[in-house]
Structure formats: C-alpha cells, structure tokens
UniProtKB/Swiss-Prot annotation:
It comes from Chilobrachys guangxiensis (Chinese earth tiger tarantula). Belongs to the neurotoxin 10 (Hwtx-1) family. 06 (F4b) subfamily. Pfam families: Toxin_12 (PF07740). Expressed by the venom gland. The presence of a 'disulfide through disulfide knot' structurally defines this protein as a knottin. GO terms for cellular component: extracellular region. The keyword Secreted applies. This is U2-theraphotoxin-Cg1a.
Length: 55
C-alpha cells in the first residue's frame, strides 16, 4: 500500500488539467483552446468563443 503523501500527490496530478489557449491564442484544433472556445479556421487561426455558456 502506498503512503498517504504519495496518494495525495497522485490525486493532484490526475486532477491537473492540461494547459489550454485563452481567447485570441493561436491554435490548430479546437482541443488546443480552453473551455467554451473553439479554433477559428480562417488564417491566422485563433481561439474564439464557441457560443456556449457555463450552466
């Protein structure tokens, strides 16, 4: 069994989200952009609001 401190570290790394691009940040796909943003396909590509809102 793992020590308590190791288990807490595992939880921290599992819950950590990947870095994302903010509004107007450069992108190549929608997954590059933060939540509620999508990659605008016209060049130059940048993250723009996808029209959704948080509930």
């Amino acid at each position: 069994d793992s020590p308590a401190w190791l288990k807490s570290m595992e939880r921290i790394f599992q819950s950590e989200e990947r870095e994302c691009r903010w509004m107007f940040g450069g992108c190549t796909t929608d997954s590059d952009c933060c939540e509620h943003l999508g990659c605008r396909w016209e060049k130059p590509s940048w993250c723009a609001w996808d029209g959704t809102v948080r509930k």
